[in-house]
């Protein structure tokens, strides 16, 4: 046998083997169409791919699995006239999808059933929310902890024991513990943290312990002198400022005029704060004015960093009575206009890169903790509730609470949705609705949750996935090829 004959025989053998290669489709997939493109998300594989309509045809034919010939045959049985060379078009596409890890040449492992394992919620504590005081000079209509703060203040005035705010010395002890536990950032919050006496001394102490200090403030109490101190002590400052329109601000955050916080932000900018950001809570009331905010903030405040946060109801009743929750489609289309306007002024925003795994990427009890003004420890600043109480720093060190608290351990080991439809959804891995706050608020009104909240979170997931498109874009064939829809 000649060398050419042997070579040809080897090639034929490889070709025959390739022809018998079986392609497997992921067990769980979410798809979203936009114009002539289709996005596919495989959560178990943590993969996103984008194809055109012809690619969608091939993937539909591949759902049952099979060889390239079998998949091409399913295509040819479709309701369209297909040109020749189907095999030549299909096989390279399938191979590319394997390369992208969307398809596989080996059977996928059985779909993960039930709940994520506790290991997925391992402790990597990095952020501590430290509530310096329950006092606040504003009366925001949507405040998530107003009732608790008001109750705590009333109990202190009545002389109730154990409810007093932590002293400066006790806060220093907390900061000592935080440093020992490797916590890198402490967020000074409240109430309004600038109402706390000696806040600057406490921030300075945190820096001495090697901890980065951040400030979350409503901005109404900042004059030029305070702005300079803040710039010296805090690495990050976030100012809650919902609107540049007086009437909107007054309705959402009564208690101080808009110009007061406007001046505060300007003072911070002039003082040279290292990282200064505006956080508007976006509601149905101020949504329409949001796209104009970046240019106005740059011109008048020299601030172009924004952390927009959508208003989320604190109870089912609030969802029905306040009417502040925005329409999902209107919200996301307006947010797109906002980001475009932000780009035009060279602004920046909180990174919304899509984390493709991690049960919604909630950091409660794992990467963050929260301590109330009276020393109670909770898994999250939005979960200061009795059922999630982990201990008190007056009775135990922070390290002891982290190690011994049944509440924190249970929270970390039970990071799965309480709502059955959520656990069956292909978007669960990236969906914000798996946050325990929402599951807790709507536990007894799941009907309302799935009617009004679920569509919003679904649209959010799609928004985040599509923002990944430029990184993972995969165009199958141009519109003139035999497999296109024409």
Describe the residue ranges of each PLM region.
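Acidic, low-complexity/disordered tracts enriched in E/D and polar residues
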Residues: 1-61, 482-486
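Flexible mid-to-C-terminal extensions adjoining Fe-S/redox cofactors in radical SAM and related proteins
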Residues: 3-8, 384-486
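Short capping segments at the starts of secondary-structure elements
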Residues: 60-70
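DNA-recognition alpha helix
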Residues: 70-80
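Conserved alpha-helical substructure of the radical SAM core
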Residues: 81-84, 88-96, 100-104, 109-229, ...
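Cys/His-rich metal-chelating microdomains
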Residues: 135, 139, 143-146, 365, ...
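Conserved, mostly hydrophobic/aromatic
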Residues: 136, 140, 375, 398
């Amino acid at each position: 046998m000649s060398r050419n004959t042997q070579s040809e025989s080897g090639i034929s053998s490889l070709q025959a083997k390739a022809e018998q290669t079986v392609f497997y489709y992921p067990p769980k997939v979410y798809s979203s169409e936009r114009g002539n493109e289709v996005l596919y998300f495989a959560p178990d594989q943590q993969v996103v791919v984008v194809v055109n309509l012809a690619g969608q045809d091939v993937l539909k034919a591949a759902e049952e699995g099979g060889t390239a010939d079998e998949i091409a045959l399913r295509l040819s049985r479709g309701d369209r006239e297909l040109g020749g060379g189907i095999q030549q078009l299909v096989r390279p596409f399938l191979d590319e999808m394997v390369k992208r890890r969307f398809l596989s040449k080996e059977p996928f492992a059985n779909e993960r059933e039930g709940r994520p394992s506790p290991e997925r919620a391992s402790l990597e504590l990095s952020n501590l929310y430290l509530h310096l005081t329950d006092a606040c000079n504003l009366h925001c209509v949507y405040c998530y902890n107003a009732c608790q703060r008001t109750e705590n203040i009333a109990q202190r005035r009545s002389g109730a024991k154990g409810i007093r705010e932590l002293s400066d010395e006790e806060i220093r002890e907390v900061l000592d513990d935080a440093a020992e536990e490797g916590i890198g950032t402490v967020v000074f919050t409240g109430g309004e943290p600038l109402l706390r006496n000696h806040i600057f001394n406490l921030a300075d102490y945190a820096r001495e312990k090697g901890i980065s200090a951040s400030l979350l403030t409503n901005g109404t109490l900042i004059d030029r002198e305070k702005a300079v101190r803040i710039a010296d002590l805090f690495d990050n400052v976030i100012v809650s400022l919902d609107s540049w329109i007086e009437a909107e601000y007054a309705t959402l955050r009564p208690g101080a005029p808009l110009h007061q916080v406007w001046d505060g932000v300007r003072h911070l900018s002039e003082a040279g704060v290292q990282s200064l950001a505006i956080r508007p809570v976006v509601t149905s009331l101020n949504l329409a004015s949001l796209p104009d905010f970046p240019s106005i903030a740059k011109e008048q405040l020299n601030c172009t960093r924004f952390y927009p946060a959508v208003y989320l109801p604190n109870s089912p009743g609030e969802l029905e009575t306040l009417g502040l929750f925005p329409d999902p489609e209107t919200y996301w289309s307006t947010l797109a206009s906002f980001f475009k306007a932000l780009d035009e002024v060279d602004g920046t925003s909180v990174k919304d890169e899509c984390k493709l795994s991690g049960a919604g990427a909630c950091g409660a009890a794992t990467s963050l903790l929260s301590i109330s003004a009276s020393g109670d420890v909770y898994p999250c600043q939005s979960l200061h509730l009795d059922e999630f109480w982990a201990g008190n720093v007056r009775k135990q060190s922070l390290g002891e609470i982290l190690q011994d608290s049944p509440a924190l351990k249970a929270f970390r080991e039970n990071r799965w949705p309480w709502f059955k439809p959520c656990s069956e959804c292909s978007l669960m891995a990236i969906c914000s609705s798996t946050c325990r706050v929402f599951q807790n608020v709507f536990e007894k009104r799941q009907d309302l949750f799935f009617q009004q909240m679920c569509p919003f979170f679904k649209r959010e997931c799609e928004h985040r996935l599509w923002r990944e498109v430029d990184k993972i874009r995969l165009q199958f064939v141009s519109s003139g090829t035999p497999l296109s829809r024409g």
